[in-house]
């Protein structure tokens, strides 16, 4: 048992020895590897220090190489413009021909692009080349401008606007095929204008050329309409009737100018771009609008000298021009300010005319040298009322003017009146009715004063004023618009005050006659010392018997005086000129006053005459018939 155990230990011991031997070899190998690593690290550091400068030099060389490539490319780009000059110069100097316009425009674009490249480098060495290119571009631009004038000039023969207006035809414009040629020419001129020195408005000679050619075409075509507008005024020099709406040529002139602008705008939109469109329209139409403004100023001068009859033309001009300015701005976005500036003097005249219309009405009434002795009305009434009826046809412009003035401020042209604070939310219809009412009251008050000065009798004054009121009332009733504006209770009451005063003035002439029929002093002398009972039958015999001889004589004198006064007033009444309505109204008023008084007086005292007619010329029936005959 001992021997096998020793053998096992011996084998294990041998294996341990082998392991120790291997471990020793591993240690030696590890030391060798460590030594190799140290040597390798040392060698790596040596290599690193050797290669570092080489790598840096390589990077520098790469940067230098890239810079050289860029310089070469820049040189190539610098050579290209010079090549373009050589390539395009011949085409440009030869000028545009009918069959080579696209090539010519392409040559201009090439030179323009080359010039832009040269100027972008900012090199002093390029200054000579830039100068040469600029000169060449200027030559080409000049030739294009000549061509533009030529092509635009082919379509500027003046036209007759009335032909197109009366037949409702569109106004002619530049043909589409011509626009297709002109548009790129203008674009080339605009591009070249950046580099080529030029004069003119809008930043481009193309705009000025277009305006210089097309502007006179519009002005010349519309010239006859301007003359016609002024000639229609000359025919009104001796006409004292109010201006009739639409009879002046300014409306047709405005329509024509509007259509010219629209036609021009359609062409401009296709030729120019951006802000150049608005500038082109303004420059092109400026001369035509200036002539239009001049015409309006001349019309305004005439209006100011004939305000009472021709202020309506001012209102019409305001209505027309204001509407045109907004319509044109809506379609083109331009020209509104030019139209409103042209309108300014007329608008000021229109404001002034409202106060002047009141003053002129008053002055004309006060200046009447004499009135018809038969009480007939003055023609001034018809003239003023026709003017007011005409005024209702201009509600839109008047609403603007009255609102800007403020309620009542039309009564004075003074600065203090014009500066009165305005109602922030005025009713234009109310303002209009107040103004019309002011004119009517001014007329009636002035004629009342004049009637008191020129008519010696109350009867003549009353008839005259009643006739005046009748004409005013008739004019109001005949005009639906005038009736609408003066239909408020306040307006009716204010106007009716004059009717009542006129009637009262006429009845004053009959007061003396009616006084003969008043016998208050005799009623106290009845028997028994008491007043007679009112109502019931009157016993004339008893009353007459109760009178003393003196009282009877006084009553007889009253009958005689009444008869004479009544006959005189009846004759005068029939001799007066009265409007149909006036004669009827005044007769009824007289009858309402005299008939009951006479009936009472006759019933009481007719027995004095005993039916002989010596004192009682009229019985109740004959007096009533006589009064009825006054109508």
From Swiss-Prot:
Pfam families: Exo70_C (PF03081), Exo70_N (PF20669)
Record-given protein name: Exocyst complex protein exo70
Similarity remark: Belongs to the EXO70 family.
Signal peptide: none
An annotated Gene Ontology molecular function: phosphatidylinositol-4,5-bisphosphate binding
Described function: Involved in the secretory pathway as part of the exocyst complex which tethers secretory vesicles to the sites of exocytosis. Also plays a role in the assembly of the exocyst.
Gene Ontology BP term (one): protein transport
Protein's gene: exo70
Lineage: Eukaryota, Fungi, Dikarya, Ascomycota, Pezizomycotina
The entry's keywords: Exocytosis, Protein transport, Transport
Coiled coil: none
Organism: Emericella nidulans (strain FGSC A4 / ATCC 38163 / CBS 112.46 / NRRL 194 / M139)
Location in or out of the cell: Bud; Bud neck
UniProt-listed InterPro entries: Cullin_repeat-like_dom_sf (IPR016159), Exo70 (IPR004140), Exo70_C (IPR046364)
Keyword Ligase in annotation: no
Gene Ontology cellular component terms for the protein in this record: cellular bud neck; exocyst
UniProt key word Protein transport: yes
